[in-house]
């Protein structure tokens, strides 16, 4: 695996090569838009490692998860719900693929546990022995999926899932329904009614949902003053966003919000990094996104060049501000 620094020249080479790979693997990949199921409102989703039957030494045990998720297909096809922004009402394959990759691909430990790769110093997403800071994950455009919030709450001290107003009640319901899949920590919340589940640990995760509208956040003191978003300098924050860039109109609001979050938290002496997962659809949209992020806004972007990712229709970007 390599971390490829994208700049105003290499970003075009990267995009070209990635779409060549996509075309080469086309026969093995689904050609739909990436919705996990267009037919079912109630989904049962298993998150676990891919098992190969071999004679080699038994692989180490990894935590596995089973989710019961309600998605709203009616709202997806509505022209009235959530001001026409309806993609968050259903579950997308980007989330399941990237989540499994982060949990079960050995190359992903550079992100979950931290370290140095290709001269890039990466702070871990999960709480570990890398440093004495607490771990906070802020997810942008969570949708109604509880998978990242619940799985990551096993390993971090604070998790905030954000989206638009009409999405949040359904997200809350799905988190409540699947809270038992957090087995390594006690869940606490100021925004979600949780059961008093017993765990053999004193470790806790503060899990919350919050309204974060990309059109409003950068100039809104009200959004920034939400106590759910607050944290102290003893935290490292990882901002994650999965499959939120699928048309050109989202690029500027998303990057403006991301930039504002980096600046805002840095001013509070919180260290910040970001991971962005994207499904490869229209090449022009990806090109416009990277141009805006790298050339116009000076984000430091590294693309994850890794075998399993390269055979898929997904990319993963590690992002920082200088």
Swiss-Prot record:
Short name of any one Pfam family annotated for the protein: Methyltransf_16
Gene3D superfamilies: Vaccinia Virus protein VP39 (3.40.50.150)
UniProt KW keywords: Methyltransferase, S-adenosyl-L-methionine, Transferase
InterPro entries xrefs: Methyltransf_16 (IPR019410), SAM-dependent_MTases_sf (IPR029063)
EC class of the enzyme, as a word: transferase
Bilayer-spanning residue ranges: none
Amino-acid positions noted as binding S-adenosyl-L-methionine in the UniProt annotation, renumbered to this chain: 92, 141-143, 163, 214, 242
GO annotation, biological process: methylation
Catalytic activity, EC: 2.1.1.-
Gene Ontology CC: one annotated term: protein-containing complex
UniProt superkingdom: Eukaryota
Keyword ATP-binding among UniProt keywords: no
Single GO MF descriptor: S-adenosylmethionine-dependent methyltransferase activity
Described purpose of this protein according to its UniProt entry: S-adenosyl-L-methionine-dependent protein-lysine N-methyltransferase that methylates 60S ribosomal protein L1.
Family: Belongs to the class I-like SAM-binding methyltransferase superfamily. RKM5 family.
Official protein name in the record: Ribosomal lysine N-methyltransferase 5
Gene: RKM5
